[in-house]
């Protein structure tokens, strides 16, 4: 038996490729010459394969750390509660707040700026969404709008995987599974109305995708005699 057969295998190749793409995006240089993932303070948004915004978040620990936890095995509340399925994320957009880079994570004034930035981004993506909604469990508290810094956006799915991941049948199956898992969480716990809204939003997203897939499928629905099976 070859020695290699006794060695533990790493992550699947497609997962490794996506993680590599995530690192490449976070290593892109901002206009100030710094890697965008190294911004300590910032706001981020995730988009699906249709370009629809699906989630907004903030961090004061580092964009790289927070985004990686969402999209890899390091669980976040949003992933654990089946609010966000990392499989749905095709693009990331980030708004680094470089002016706060040297501020302590507990700095009150900096937190106010971060909260304003997140609220501004939240309103921005809601206007971009054809559903008028994202999957966040709660609304971002209203604050004074902030002039946002220049954002950077990129696709995290390698070209060789994109068409497979975007295939509507794959996405329908995945989204239905996520909805079932979220519905189970809701049935077993006392949850917020926001989580029920997330379930509703996911159901609407699934209905649209399933309807689009049905309408683009050629042929007619079969007709059978009573008692016959297709």
What residues fall within each predicted segment?
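Short, hydrophobic/aromatic alpha-helical segments in well-folded domains
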Residues: 42-43, 66
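GIY-YIG nuclease signature motif recognition
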Residues: 44-46, 53-61
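Boundary/linker segments flanking structured domains
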Residues: 1-39, 49-52, 68-230
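PAPS-dependent sulfotransferase catalytic domain
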Residues: 60-68
